[in-house]
Amino acid sequence: MKSDIHVCAVWESEHDRPVYTLDDTCPECGAEAVNSAPAPFSPEDSYGEYRRSLKRRSRE
């Protein structure tokens, strides 16, 4: 799911704290703002299959 909230991509080097915005650019430094929500899972997750199977077993 894509979030409407963005965070400055260079906040660690340019700001003291994360700068959040609804725009595509940072309001303080003008740098690109990126999606602040993490991905729900990684396709390269090598242990994801095992975690999901354990979760399925615990539901049964």
From Swiss-Prot:
One of the record's GO molecular function terms: snoRNA binding
The protein's name: Ribosome biogenesis protein Nop10
Family as reported in the entry's similarity comment: Belongs to the NOP10 family.
Organism (species): Haloarcula marismortui (strain ATCC 43049 / DSM 3752 / JCM 8966 / VKM B-1809)
Region (Disordered): 36-60
Keywords: Ribonucleoprotein, Ribosome biogenesis, rRNA processing
Protein origin, superkingdom: Archaea
Cross-referenced InterPro entries: H/ACA_rnp_Nop10, H/ACA_rnp_Nop10_sf, Nop10_arc-typ
Biological process annotations from GO: pseudouridine synthesis; rRNA processing
Its job: Involved in ribosome biogenesis; more specifically in 18S rRNA pseudouridylation and in cleavage of pre-rRNA.
